[in-house]
Amino acid sequence: MGFHLITQLKGMSVVLVLLPTLLLVMLTGAQRACPKNCRCDGKIVYCESHAFADIPENISGGSQGLSLRFNSIQKLKSNQFAGLNQLIWLYLDHNYISSVDEDAFQGIRRLKELILSSNKITYLHNKTFHPVPNLRNLDLSYNKLQTLQSEQFKGLRKLIILHLRSNSLKTVPIRVFQDCRNLDFLDLGYNRLRSLSRNAFAGLLKLKELHLEHNQFSKINFAHFPRLFNLRSIYLQWNRIRSISQGLTWTWSSLHNLDLSGNDIQGIEPGTFKCLPNLQKLNLDSNKLTNISQETVNAWISLISITLSGNMWECSRSICPLFYWLKNFKGNKESTMICAGPKHIQGEKVSDAVETYNICSEVQVVNTERSHLVPQTPQKPLIIPRPTIFKPDVTQSTFETPSPSPGFQIPGAEQEYEHVSFHKIIAGSVALFLSVAMILLVIYVSWKRYPASMKQLQQHSLMKRRRKKARESERQMNSPLQEYYVDYKPTNSETMDISVNGSGPCTYTISGSRECEMPHHMKPLPYYSYDQPVIGYCQAHQPLHVTKGYETVSPEQDESPGLELGRDHSFIATIARSAAPAIYLERIAN
């Protein structure tokens, strides 16, 4: 019996030991319950894209990561995340947050990454980020911030990355980043900044990359970036910068990349780059530069990449320092530099224009002439051969004036004729070839797609040619034919003579032949017959025949042989010498 009692006591002790363990496991499981419409992965909670208007409840206090992206949260209240003291990162981007309480981040001191981008935040209190001194990454980009408070980032000594991109900031307060000693990356691009105070970036001793692109700066002085000994890259592209000055009393040896593209820079002061001896990459494209001085290119001793396209290069002798520097430059360079002037070489590549028009060779010739201006034998003038057409008058004038004016033009073939570049010939040939190919293609497609129309067109053109040939042949047949007619124009007195006396002048006219006049000695009214009328002229004179008593000869009379013509019998015979048949006129006796 005692043995059974001991066994029961041992069983009870085991149950008492296991019961607290089970309760602890159950409590832990309840504590780690995942909120509705969320996804939990260990200590990471994802409540994304479910239109949450507030922070979900029942989030485990031991969660280390919380993502509330793409929801409809509009406001962050005081102590909103107080129960989540183990949070390391918090994503609140792509919401509609417009108001943030200054105590919204109380209780999450361990937070290292806070993303508030793509919201509608217009204002942040001075102490908003004081409860999170361990922040490494703070993203406030793509909001509507208009100002930064003077102590906005106070105490953020561990901050490494700060995004303020695409807001509406107009100024940067003095020493606003004073406590951000470890800041490595600062993005202030796409704002409305017009100027920078001298101490705006004071305290950023470890800053390596600074973005100021797409703002409204009109001038830049390197003195506005004091003692940024570790800054390697600065981006100032697409502002309104017209001038650059250095104003530094120290050497900025850490800067490697400088982007000034897309501005309105018209000129660079000669000593601007002297304080940047280690500059490796320089972007000056899409500005309004016309030339670069010799002193400036001499300061580019460490460059390995440069872009200069999209400027208004003046292809005169002022471009020569840059041309020779680029010719000897072995790094990565932009080769599409186009001349904006003078007018006769606009659109040419700078390198082609300089070599074609000998723009810089003249400068070398002038220097050579200067070195020989003091000859030992003045009786023998020094003659320097030129690669272009030699003109003694020009050479002589060069010796008389050893310092030519800047507007001096090179005498040579370029003044007599305009040079045609080889690439223009190639481009024209290609354009002509493409035009012919396009025409042939259109004809081929039309022939394949509409064969009946093409056949009709060919038949129409063939018929047109046939008609034209028929007209020409008809014109050739009609041209030798002559018009024959009898012109009888009696006056009143002659009519009376003919009717009374039976005689009078009669005029017969053959067009293109001859005109004859013959008197008639007839008795009573004579009768005439026309043999083989040609064009119906006898029919045309039928009324005259009826009036005067003329009648057509009978066939029996027409066949009478031995027709004799003579003045005694008053017969007239006219034979046409053309393609028309002969006409015989015969007097018939009553």
Curated annotation (Swiss-Prot):
Residues 446-590 are cytoplasmic. Residues 31-61 form the LRRNT domain. Expressed in neuronal tissues. LRR repeats lie at residues 62-83, 86-107, 110-131, 134-155, 158-179, 182-203, 206-226, 230-251, 254-275, 278-299. Keywords: Cell membrane, Glycoprotein, Leucine-rich repeat, Membrane, Postsynaptic cell membrane, Repeat, Signal, Synapse, Transmembrane, Transmembrane helix. The chain crosses the membrane at residues 425-445. Gene3D superfamilies: Ribonuclease Inhibitor. It is a single-pass type I membrane protein. Glycans are attached at residues 58, 126, 291. One of its GO terms (cellular component) is postsynaptic membrane. Residues 1-30 form the signal peptide. It is found in: Cell membrane; Postsynaptic cell membrane. Residues 31-424 are extracellular. Residues 311-362 form the LRRCT domain. May play a role in the development and maintenance of the vertebrate nervous system. Exhibits strong synaptogenic activity, restricted to excitatory presynaptic differentiation. Belongs to the LRRTM family. Peripherally associated with AMPAR complex. AMPAR complex consists of an inner core made of 4 pore-forming GluA/GRIA proteins (GRIA1, GRIA2, GRIA3 and GRIA4) and 4 major auxiliary subunits arranged in a twofold symmetry. One of the two pairs of distinct binding sites is occupied either by CNIH2, CNIH3 or CACNG2, CACNG3. The other harbors CACNG2, CACNG3, CACNG4, CACNG8 or GSG1L. This inner core of AMPAR complex is complemented by outer core constituents binding directly to the GluA/GRIA proteins at sites distinct from the interaction sites of the inner core constituents. This is Leucine-rich repeat transmembrane neuronal protein 4. It comes from Homo sapiens. The gene is LRRTM4.
